């Protein structure tokens, strides 16, 4: 979603974001991607959420936990995009790896394939269980597709009002054909 910061609560170390749902979402400081942190941190021992965000600032978020009862959804700015074989985490370079369901020799083979992928700086990738038995070429193709999709989403986010929703369902990927 492309949301708008509606309120900053330094005492909670969080912001509330209007992203089009009935209740505003809750975005804790720890869920802020590096791009939202101040560039110049000199002389600052601790950074507060009010140093990172401002009221009415637009921000791209993903729902981590749906709203329940009287609580709004839990949000993160570390969004991810799921492809056929991979999950791309555009602003989380330390994240990544291989699905926990894959073990043994298969895991070792995928580690090798993962190391051969051309993953852009500041991005992370997880190989899904569907990536098992896929060549490095097929995995790279899926990664390239996800990067292009991310670029399109960001372009749309720049030019549209907030509340932009992007849901990639495995059965609704237009134009996502195997190599």
Please tell me what each predicted stretch does:
Residues 1-179:
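Single-stranded RNA-binding surfaces
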């Amino acid at each position: 979603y492309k949301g708008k910061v509606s309120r900053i609560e330094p005492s909670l170390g969080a912001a509330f974001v209007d992203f089009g749902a009935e209740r505003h979402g809750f975005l804790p400081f720890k869920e802020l991607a590096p791009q939202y942190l101040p560039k110049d941190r000199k002389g600052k021992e601790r950074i507060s959420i009010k140093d990172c965000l401002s009221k009415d600032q637009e921000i791209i978020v993903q729902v981590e936990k749906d709203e329940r009862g009287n609580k709004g959804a839990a949000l993160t700015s570390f969004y991810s995009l799921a492809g056929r074989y991979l999950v791309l985490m555009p602003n989380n370079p330390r994240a990544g790896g291989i699905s926990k369901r894959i073990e043994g020799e298969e895991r070792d083979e995928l580690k090798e394939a993962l190391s051969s992928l051309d993953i852009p700086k500041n991005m992370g990738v997880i190989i899904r269980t569907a990536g098992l038995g896929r060549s490095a070429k097929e995995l790279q193709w899926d990664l390239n597709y996800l990067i292009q999709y991310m670029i399109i989403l960001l372009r749309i986010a720049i030019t549209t009002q907030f509340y932009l929703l992007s849901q990639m369902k495995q059965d609704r990927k237009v134009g996502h054909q195997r190599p």
